[in-house]
């Protein structure tokens, strides 16, 4: 005759956690929360910086396509410098294309385009102004572009009225590279004072 299997004891033993096991699990969870939660905002911002760099890379490719189509680089200034990608048909006027022309570090609600559908943002170049994007385009009126050069700044996160990212400014150069400027580095280089935590973009910028 088979001996009865003692399933009841096994079932009872595995029916739940003991108090000690629960306390240990809660302690481990607390440690993980204390370590990970403060890093979540940093991780989110870094993801937005990566997305912004991708936008700038795509814009550069668009501007080189513009040059191939029209035999020159755009002569417009500010946001219009890159808004021509949509207004002149280099890019298809879609929501995805329009969203590439502004920095993901700044909420759309802070811009003049907040109440417009994306397909209307850059369709009419005459309506576009500096409040239509969180990127600052080159001032081609005072600094015209003739050829692509790694020494020329084309587009940057505009930092207007405050930093797009907490400590980071991105600058698209004429050779397609994107420079990452950090406040701490600029302080060490003497570009900013030790207590300055804001980098102005534009003609009055301390960074050349």
Residue ranges with predicted function:
Residues 1-17:
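N-terminal leader/signal peptides at the extreme start of proteins
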Residues 13, 137, 173:
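Acidic surface patches and DE-rich sequence motifs
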Residues 13-40:
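N-terminal single-pass transmembrane signal-anchor helix
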Residues 34-100:
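Conserved hydrophobic/amphipathic alpha-helical signal-anchor segments
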Residues 67, 74, 100-104, 155-156, ...:
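Structural recognition of the beta-strand scaffold that forms the well-ordered cores
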Residues 67-68, 74-76, 81-85, 109-113, ...:
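Short catalytic/ligand-binding loop motif for oxyanion handling, primarily in non-cytosolic enzymes
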Residues 92-153:
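Acidic, glycine-rich loop-and-strand cores that form catalytic or ligand-binding grooves
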Residues 154-208:
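C-terminal accessory segments of extracellular proteins
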């Amino acid at each position: 005759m088979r001996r009865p299997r003692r399933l009841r004891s096994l079932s009872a033993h595995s029916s739940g956690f003991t108090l000690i096991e629960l306390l240990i699990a809660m302690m481990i969870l607390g440690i993980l929360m204390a370590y990970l939660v403060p890093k979540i905002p940093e991780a989110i911002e870094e993801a937005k910086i990566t997305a912004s760099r991708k936008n700038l890379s795509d814009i550069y490719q668009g501007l080189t396509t513009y040059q191939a189509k029209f035999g020159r680089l755009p002569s417009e200034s500010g946001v219009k410098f890159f808004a021509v990608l949509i207004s002149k048909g280099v890019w298809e006027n879609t929501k995805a294309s329009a969203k590439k022309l502004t920095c993901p570090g700044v909420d759309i609600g802070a811009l003049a385009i907040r109440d417009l559908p994306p397909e209307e943002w850059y369709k009419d170049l005459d309506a576009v102004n500096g409040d239509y994007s969180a990127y600052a385009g080159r001032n081609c009126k005072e600094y015209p572009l003739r050829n692509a050069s790694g020494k020329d700044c084309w587009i940057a996160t505009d930092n207007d009225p405050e930093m797009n990212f907490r400590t980071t400014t991105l600058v698209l150069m004429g050779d397609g590279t994107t420079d990452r400027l950090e406040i701490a580095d600029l302080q060490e280089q003497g570009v900013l004072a030790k207590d300055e935590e804001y980098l102005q973009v534009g003609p009055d910028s301390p960074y050349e």
